Amino acid sequence: MQNIIKNGKESNSVPLQGLGVDSPLGGEGIFYHFTFSEVAPTFAEILDFIKSTNLEEEHPAIVFIKEVLPQLNLDTGISGYYILKNLEELRLKDGLICIENIEFNLGRQLCGYIKEATQVALFVCTAGEYFTQLTNRLNEQGDIMEAYILDAIGSLTVEKAMDKIQESLKIKMLEKELKISNRYSPGYCNWPLSDQQNLFQLIGENPTGIALSDSCLMTPRKSVSGLIGLGKNLKLHEYGCKICNNTTCIYRRILHE
């Protein structure tokens, strides 16, 4: 049975959505559930993300944000999960790692960032289907500005949820005298999106409800996945946005703009 963390507290109850997969390190997958208020972006963060920091109070964007934030407390699908795996091989020159005989084409940049790792945490996290449903409804109504803002709030929400999971992982690993890397996702930092298939294969059945399409896109739409390196001698590297080819990356927007 995996551990469950609800509202910051850990329990041994079984989620209705399914069971996780035992870790080969003797540990177990850990499931997190959050209320929107626990991971909600601030008003300032939303305005900064959509590059609208100097709007008047009566601007439609400001009015919409004030109206929609309380509604998002109805979102019960914000959740995340990670499972620990041994890092069997890392070939820096080839930009490859191997986990349970499955190769990942991380590229030399990311391999360099986790070259001291001996284990990895494979993760998934979602802001839930509620964001997708509301955004689709707004688009159908022709409320394009509102749909764009809600999409931005969803992006920020899932990242803030993953921030909390990463911090929890950091604390747990410190107890084992292990350090962690930043988190990295397929489709970012020059890591091919196609590696999503292998990532989900290793994560296995989990209670987040995230599904992967044949084109490697996740549903619910506001979901993230990836890995975090773990190791005693691991060094924390900043994201290499200056040498990354992805000009639309959410991390570039959050960290540097």
Language model regions located:
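Active-site helix-to-loop segments that bind/position phosphate- or nucleotide-bearing substrates
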Residues: 2-9, 29-147
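Glycine-biased, low-complexity coil/linker segments
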Residues: 17-20, 24-28
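Catalytic cores of large soluble enzymes that bind and process phosphate-bearing ligands
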Residues: 57-64, 150-153, 157, 161, ...
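Short terminal or interdomain "cap/linker" segment that borders an active site or interface and mediates
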Residues: 176-251
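Short cysteine/histidine-rich zinc-coordinating motifs and their immediately flanking basic loops
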Residues: 253-257
